[in-house]
A protein has these predicted regions:
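Low-complexity, glycine/alanine/valine/leucine- and proline-rich hydrophobic stretches
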Residues: 446, 450-495
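Short, surface-exposed alpha-helical segments at coil->helix boundaries
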Residues: 84-91, 477, 481
Length: 503
């Protein structure tokens, strides 16, 4: 068994799939799929109704993984159509029946892995800084549209347009005398109304359409992982779907009735986006969130560089800008917080994996001022809860909200209550990150950036933060003393601040 082999099981509301992957070559050695789950009713009911079939498939996947002698395997599930409680129950039933532990992926994570997959395309490395690229992906519950400048991530927009809406549209148009394409077009146009009003970059643009080989999208299926098609060719496809009878479409594009019903809205959607974006090129690719998961595992094991951490931080900065935050105070708090964290990490007192979460909290802790200065930390948590950070898991989102709520020094007695709902192991991690951010915020309490530099030393169960400033720090000292108790409690040492007069 090669250590570079990886078993990836992915469960969606359509079927379960196993991929045996060579992480070094990033190629699929073998792929197995369950029978497609019976659709009908609400999509979230599919998991429950098809549990016996899903269980049988997973047991078969375990046997195949054992045949390869693979120890490194993971099970992921698409949670977009499940609430958290139902997902927890289903995960427990799967574990009892198969021994497999499933990691559910929320919509923000799935969007993140789709972006990674798009960035890994060979064509992506050819993009120049004067070119903009839109990455379009249809998901089980959301449509994701991501914008890049050159090879750099800029932003992602999410639209509530998934299979359920598409199937409802299909049912609605079956018995109407009006042209179904016109009705579908009006519905999709309504979904895109906000995007139409957003100021979009001018200049050369292309559009990449992901996962075109998925269920119900055979008419756009490429023979390779990615290919460029002429926009006139797509215009011909759109014309067919607008003018031709269903029987002709099913024969020409090899579609069944259900696939055709799902395909029509997809074609209309792409056509509307082409009109808005006006790309000079269209690329079709089979890449999907599954591709992104493979790439992530390859990066984790150092088979390829991890080039994607900037996506999460860029998305964070976008939220900060939207709510008129992210200025000098936010940048300085972030700088000080990461410096303190790194010294504590060197001493083995924090988990290095939490560094990114601390940076996100540092950049977003003041966005609640957009709503109201009073209780602005509560407002910050509310805003973040309503704007899921791309790439963060449900657990990481819960931790982030708790860290933000912890910053209210006027309500220090509420500390324990803010994270009591978390798992015990997470409570300590949250308290540590919240304590670090409090200390960092204290050092710019006046919002005047009086301190230019800090040096953190840890010795004999004491932490000394030496700050460089030639200005009066009375306010900073006072706020520091108000905040230091939590840090001393969670790190088990005395913490002091010392001023060094700078030039």
């Amino acid at each position: 068994m090669s250590k570079r082999q990886f078993g990836l099981i992915y469960i969606s509301s359509y079927q379960a799939r196993l991929f045996i992957v060579d992480l070094k070559k990033l190629s699929i050695i073998e792929q197995l799929s369950s029978a497609q789950f019976v659709q009908g009713g609400k999509k979230f009911e599919v998991y429950e109704n098809e549990l016996p079939r899903l269980t049988d498939a997973l047991i078969g996947f375990k046997r195949k993984i054992a045949e390869y002698g693979i120890d490194n395997y993971k099970v992921y599930g698409n949670r977009q159509l499940l609430d958290k409680i139902s997902a927890r129950y289903l995960a427990d039933q799967i574990k009892v029946r198969t021994g497999l532990e499933i990691e559910w992926l929320n919509g923000a994570q799935i969007a993140y892995y789709k972006i990674i997959a798009g960035m890994a395309l060979p064509q992506f490395s050819e993009l120049t800084d004067d070119e903009f690229t839109y990455l379009l992906s249809m998901g089980s519950a959301m449509l994701n549209l991501t914008l890049f400048k050159g090879q750099h991530y800029l932003s992602t927009w999410n639209f509530a347009l998934g299979p359920e809406e598409i199937e409802e549209m299909a049912a609605m148009t079956r018995d109407t005398p009006s042209d179904p394409i016109d009705i579908i077009g009006d519905y999709i146009s309504r979904k895109l109304v906000s995007f139409k009003t957003i100021e979009k970059p001018t200049g050369k643009a292309r559009i990449i359409i992901q996962h075109v080989s998925g269920r119900g999208e055979q008419s756009l299926r490429p023979q390779e992982k990615a290919r460029v098609i002429d926009l006139k060719q797509f215009a011909g496809v759109y014309s067919d779907f607008r003018e031709a009878p269903d029987q002709y479409l099913m024969e020409k594009y090899e579609l069944d009735t259900d696939s055709l019903a799902r395909m029509k809205p997809t074609i209309v959607l792409i056509n509307q986006l082409v009109k808005i974006i006006k790309p000079h090129m269209m690329t079709l690719t089979q890449s999907s969130a599954i591709t992104g998961l493979m790439i992530q595992e390859a990066a984790r094991l150092k088979y390829r560089p991890d080039e994607y951490s900037t996506i999460v931080l860029t998305a964070t900065k976008n939220i900060a800008r939207r709510y008129e935050s992210g200025g000098k105070h936010s940048n300085l708090s972030n700088k000080f917080a990461l410096h303190i964290f790194d010294r504590l990490a060197h001493a083995g007192m924090v988990d290095r994996r939490d560094r990114q979460l601390l940076e996100i909290a540092a950049r977003l802790h003041d966005i609640g001022n957009f709503v109201n200065f009073h209780n602005h930390y509560e407002h910050a948590a509310y805003i973040v809860g309503a704007n899921q950070i791309i790439g963060l898991s449900d657990r990481e989102n819960e931790m982030l909200l708790s860290i933000l709520k912890h910053q209210d020094i006027t309500n220090l007695n509420a500390d324990e209550r803010e994270y009591r709902h978390l798992d015990p192991a997470l409570q300590v991690r949250v308290a540590k990150l919240a304590a670090i951010l409090r200390l960092a915020n204290s050092l710019d309490a006046s919002r005047k950036q009086k301190i230019s530099k800090i040096v953190v030393s840890i010795k004999d169960e004491q932490m000394l933060i030496t700050v460089t400033s030639k200005r009066d720090l009375t306010l900073e000292r006072w706020v520091f003393e108000k905040n230091v108790n939590l840090a001393e409690a969670v790190f088990g040492m005395k913490i002091a601040m010392k001023q060094k007069r700078g030039k």
